[in-house]
């Protein structure tokens, strides 16, 4: 007997908990930013920008990992001199990150960067240079991100509020935006970052209520990979589920590619980005009759790089195992030294425990191949005999 089974995630992601906040629209190079465009994932290179080859190599790695926009530091003249080559050869838009020296803003604009991030809290006499910056950026047709950080907040705000409160961050950002608007420049994106996700979330909520600028989300100095992932997921999840946020950067003390992986996973978890491969595995407990940790890790490693929207469930006992496996596109429910292999709710075979990983990988590859072949003719299906 032969039947056909539909596979794959929904073609259109489910709506988030709240409608997307309406914003003005910007173009950062080829990437649209604002409520009419998908939320984009950014990262920042960790190389010395003047080392052009190393920087371009890291940008290539970020591009391959799914990064949409990349930011590069520009603390020295030699870094500014390298921007033109980097901006020209990068496959994704390059944003120059400017602190302290206003002349590097103009160097970045002249170099053809897709946007410039300025920190009004530490650029010398920035308010007095806004007219020049607005004129140069407007002539080049590139946006400016006003990036306010708790750690480098304008001294005037610190004197007024005593510390980096949500109100202080928001007032600083909107003050600088108003100066640009006075000179006819409105292609502005704003960030108000803090290392405390609770303060950060409140700052963005206040900011979102007071303007229509696109917002770049970030928890600054979030920490090592584990801690930073948790902080960013909590903060971004809260805001994005409210429709707030147009670009994100997960700041981790880890390789930049890891930032992109986490950011992408956050968006996928909220159905703000089409899902690709998803491994569902149980946390294990005393009921487990198989080494779930090893099994899940081996399956994940074996399927790394798979681009199809496939949910694979790796379950360790008979309590939730069969149910979870049936809900997935492909799954295994393990117990008594063997595993039942499910494809979209139907058991297709039972294999010995030592063959589970190999069988899951083989079935996933087979399904992926069939999905690829049928991608142009509607929803993918798999034939089960």
Curated annotation (Swiss-Prot):
Keywords: 4Fe-4S, Iron, Iron-sulfur, Isoprene biosynthesis, Metal-binding, Oxidoreductase. Its cofactor is [4Fe-4S] cluster. One of its GO terms (molecular function) is 4-hydroxy-3-methylbut-2-enyl-diphosphate synthase activity (flavodoxin). Pathway: Isoprenoid biosynthesis; isopentenyl diphosphate biosynthesis via DXP pathway; isopentenyl diphosphate from 1-deoxy-D-xylulose 5-phosphate: step 5/6. GO terms for biological process: isopentenyl diphosphate biosynthetic process, methylerythritol 4-phosphate pathway; terpenoid biosynthetic process. Its EC number is 1.17.7.3. [4Fe-4S] cluster binds at residues 282, 285, 317, 324. Belongs to the IspG family. NCBIfam families: ispG_gcpE, PRK00366.1. Converts 2C-methyl-D-erythritol 2,4-cyclodiphosphate (ME-2,4cPP) into 1-hydroxy-2-methyl-2-(E)-butenyl 4-diphosphate. This is 4-hydroxy-3-methylbut-2-en-1-yl diphosphate synthase (flavodoxin). The gene is ispG.
